[in-house]
Regions:
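Glycine-rich phosphate-binding P-loop
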Residues: 261
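Conserved protein-kinase catalytic-loop segment immediately C-terminal to the catalytic Asp
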Residues: 264, 269-272
Length: 358
C-alpha cells in the first residue's frame, strides 16, 4: 500500500509500507519528516519508522492527562506503540489544526477542501473528552478528527466559535491564574504573543486563547525545525536568530520577567506561510501556565532556549536587553498582583535588573 503525504491539495511525497519512497515536492515536506529515496534496505526501514513516528506525533502525547480515556474510546491499547498510534491518526488522515499537512491512501478520492478542520465543524463531545476525561461512545469516535497534538501535561481542547477556534486549557485554578496573570504582564511589552483570558468550563476555570494558525499560516515547533536543520547541515539557533532575532530575545526577556520555567522545544518555534512552506518569523509567544516558578531570586531557572550554552534566565534576559532593549510599551498595573504581593516584589526586582543592564 502507498500513502500520499499531502500539503493542502498537493502530494509532497509517496511512501509504501515497505519504505519505498518518492519525494514529489521537497520544499513542501513537513519539517520534521525525513524520507530518503533509496533501494537500501536499512534506509527504507528508516523511512517507515520516520513516517509512523511523524503520524504518531500528530495524535496525542501519552503523558497527557486523560489519554487513557481517549484511547479507550477508540478501542486502542493503553500502551500503544508509534505504529499503533500512527494507525489511529491515519484513520483521521493525520489532520491537525496546527498545519495543513494530511495523509491519504493512494487513489483515495478525498480533498483537503472537504475535510480540513479549519472549515469543518467539531463536536462538543470532543471538548468533554479532552478536558474532563468523559467516556466517549463508539458512535462518536469519528469526532476525534481534531487537533489532539497540542502536547503538554495539561488537558486542552479546541473549541469552535463563530469567529474561529479557541484553545481551552485546564490544569487547575492555580495553573490558569498563572497563565492569565503572565499574559497581562506580557501585554505591556512589544511582542507577538497569544492573549490568554480566564473563562469557565463545567464550573471549572480554564484559560482561553484564540488559534494562531489558519489555512494560510502554520506552526512549526523548534523541535521540528531542529530536525530539518540537522538534516540540512544548519545550526538551528543561528537560523532562528537570522530569521527573527527580536522575537527570540523578547521571549527570553518575558520568560525571565514572569518566571516561566517551561519554555521547552515544543512550545516555541516558527510561523510558516503555507503558500511557500517557508518561515516568516517566530510564532506568537504562548504557554505561560508554569509561570512564577523559581521566582524567589533574581537569577531564575536555567534558560532552556540558548542551545548548548549554560545561562540562567537572568543572564539570557540581560543578553537580550543589550541586543534589542526592553521594549516596554506601558506600565504594568500594580493591581494585577493583588492576590500575589510576593510575586509583585520579585517582578519589580527583575524589571530593575533589566533596566540597569541597558
Amino acid at each position: 500500500m502507498f500513502y500520499e503525504i499531502m500539503h493542502r491539495e498537493s502530494c509532497v511525497a509517496q511512501l509504501s509500507t515497505t519504505g519505498e519512497c518518492r519525494v514529489c515536492l521537497e520544499d513542501f515536506m513537513p519539517y520534521d519528516l525525513v524520507l530518503v529515496e533509496s533501494d537500501d534496505f536499512d534506509e527504507r526501514i528508516n523511512n517507515v519508522t520516520n513516517f509512523y513516528y511523524w503520524c504518531a506525533s500528530r495524535m496525542l502525547t501519552l503523558d497527557r492527562t486523560y489519554a487513557k480515556e481517549i484511547l479507550n474510546s477508540i478501542g486502542a491499547s493503553q500502551s500503544v506503540t508509534d505504529r499503533e498510534r500512527a494507525q489511529i491518526a491515519l484513520s483521521y488522515h493525520c489532520l491537525s489544526l496546527l498545519d495543513v499537512f494530511w495523509v491519504k491512501e493512494e487513489n483515495e478520492k478525498i480533498r483537503f477542501e472537504d475535510i480540513n478542520l479549519f472549515a469543518h465543524s467539531l463536536s462538543n463531545a470532543l471538548v468533554d473528552i479532552a478536558l474532563r476525561g468523559h467516556q466517549m461512545t463508539v458512535t462518536n469516535a469519528h469526532l476525534l478528527a481534531n487537533d489532539l497534538s497540542t502536547g503538554g501535561l495539561y488537558p486542552k481542547a479546541w473549541v469552535r466559535k463563530e469567529d474561529g477556534f479557541y484553545l481551552y486549557k485546564d490544569g487547575g485554578r492555580e495553573a490558569v491564574e498563572r497563565e492569565v496573570l503572565a499574559s497581562k504582564i506580557c501585554r505591556c511589552f512589544d511582542c507577538h504573543q497569544v492573549l490568554y483570558e480566564q473563562g469557565m468550563f463545567e464550573n471549572e476555570p480554564v484559560s482561553i486563547s484564540k488559534i494562531m494558525t489558519s489555512q494560510r499560516y502554520s506552526l512549526v515547533t523548534y523541535a521540528a525545525y531542529d530536525v530539518y536543520c540537522t538534516n540540512h547541515d544548519g545550526n538551528t539557533l543561528d537560523k532562528i536568530l537570522e530569521l527573527d532575532a527580536p522575537s527570540y530575545y523578547m521571549m527570553n526577556i518575558l520568560d525571565y520577567l514572569v518566571g516561566n520555567t517551561d519554555r521547552h522545544w515544543e512550545n516555541w518555534g516558527l510561523l510558516v506561510d503555507n503558500e511557500t512552506n517557508q518561515p516568516i518569523r517566530l510564532h506568537d509567544l504562548m504557554d505561560f501556565n508554569r509561570s512564577f516558578q523559581q521566582y524567589d531570586t533574581p537569577e531564575g531557572a536555567n534558560c532552556l532556549t540558548v542551545g548548548k550554552r549554560h545561562l540562567s534566565q537572568k543572564d539570557a534576559a540581560v543578553e537580550a536587553v543589550r541586543n534589542i532593549g526592553l521594549n516596554q510599551v506601558r506600565q504594568v498595573e500594580h493591581t494585577v498582583f493583588s492576590e500575589h504581593p510576593a510575586w509583585k516584589a520579585t517582578f519589580e526586582e527583575r524589571l530593575r535588573v533589566l533596566r540597569n543592564a541597558m
